[in-house]
Amino acid sequence: MERNQRKTLVGRVVSDKMDKTITVVVETKRNHPVYGKRINYSKKYKAHDENNVAKEGDIVRIMETRPLSATKRFRLVEVVEEAVII
């Protein structure tokens, strides 16, 4: 499988407390199959962050990769937008 065919997701980092691992929440909107109302869905993914560059609150792009641990199946591609520290 080539790299350009792998899934890429954009989400927000909700945890960076682990070494070389971040937790990313990806939010999507779908229509309800019967009623047609737009419903928000969110799912958490653990992603590999080799250099510990992503911080909590950042918007990041992650890409599907081989299994890196029992729960990690994604890796960090880039930090799209850094969080504003107040």
Curated annotation (Swiss-Prot):
Q: Does the keyword Phosphoprotein apply?
A: no
The UniProt entry, under PROSITE patterns, shows: RIBOSOMAL_S17 (PS00056)
InterPro entries given in the database record: NA-bd_OB-fold, Ribosomal_uS17, Ribosomal_uS17_bact/chlr, Ribosomal_uS17_CS
Q: Which Pfam families match?
A: Ribosomal_S17 (PF00366)
Q: Does the keyword Transcription apply?
A: no
Show the SUPFAM superfamilies listed in the entry: Nucleic acid-binding proteins (SSF50249)
Question: Molecular function terms in GO for this entry?
Answer: rRNA binding; structural constituent of ribosome
Record keywords, A-Z: Ribonucleoprotein, Ribosomal protein, RNA-binding, rRNA-binding
Tell me the GO BP annotations in alphabetical order.
Answer: translation
Q: Which Gene3D superfamilies match?
A: Nucleic acid-binding proteins
Any one GO cellular component localisation term in the record: cytosolic small ribosomal subunit
Q: Which family does it belong to?
A: Belongs to the universal ribosomal protein uS17 family.
Function of this protein?
A: One of the primary rRNA binding proteins, it binds specifically to the 5'-end of 16S ribosomal RNA.
Which HAMAP family does this one have? Ribosomal_uS17_B
* Oligomer status and interactors: Part of the 30S ribosomal subunit.
Q: What is this protein called?
A: Small ribosomal subunit protein uS17
What phylogenetic lineage does the species belong to? Bacteria, Bacillati, Bacillota, Bacilli, Lactobacillales
Gene name linked to the record? rpsQ
